[in-house]
Amino acid sequence: MPNFWILENRRSYTSDTCMSRIVKEYKVILKTLASDDPIANPYRGIIESLNPIDETDLSKWEAIISGPSDTPYENHQFRILIEVPSSYPMNPPKISFMQNNILHCNVKSATGEICLNILKPEEWTPVWDLLHCVHAVWRLLREPVCDSPLDVDIGNIIRCGDMSAYQGIVKYFLAERERINNH
């Protein structure tokens, strides 16, 4: 269990508002994700983990999400990197997939960059928290937005309605990813 007193009194990288907010969120994340109760943990089977990479620095986080059922991402897990700016919660965190980890119309595969409206400064509201942001990324896997693609080719396939081609390409990509990672 992290020493929250030390975290709350650490001011090296961020503002008091940011540190106070992120420590509160961390406590909620630990409690929520530890619960087996589906009401207390609506993210069960969605967000497998959400933790700071280093418990002494709450500016960098890592999440593991499960691919949504009935999508080509089903039965796969994806690592998400989260950078919390010192201006959080007034500005959004920067969230990206691990490089070359996923093929999706709203993700630039080479960098992991995600195109998601709530993560844009002009759309962001401090009401959102890290759990909700990670859940929104998971929902993007379920419901791609082909009108704002970072991968234009995948976006065009979806826009044309060729879902079997989309699913086939993604499944092939993920099978290759798994094959490479197992060697």
From Swiss-Prot:
Name the keywords, alphabetized: ATP-binding, Nucleotide-binding, Peroxisome, Peroxisome biogenesis, Transferase, Ubl conjugation pathway
The record's section on PROSITE patterns has:
UBC_1, UBC_2
> Domain named UBC core: which ranges?
17-179
Cross-referenced Pfam families, in alphabetical order? UQ_con (PF00179)
Example GO biological process: protein monoubiquitination
- Reaction(s) this enzyme catalyzes, per UniProt: S-ubiquitinyl-[E1 ubiquitin-activating enzyme]-L-cysteine + [E2 ubiquitin-conjugating enzyme]-L-cysteine = [E1 ubiquitin-activating enzyme]-L-cysteine + S-ubiquitinyl-[E2 ubiquitin-conjugating enzyme]-L-cysteine
Q: What is this protein called?
A: Ubiquitin-conjugating enzyme E2-21 kDa
Q: Which species expresses this protein natively?
A: Saccharomyces cerevisiae (strain ATCC 204508 / S288c)
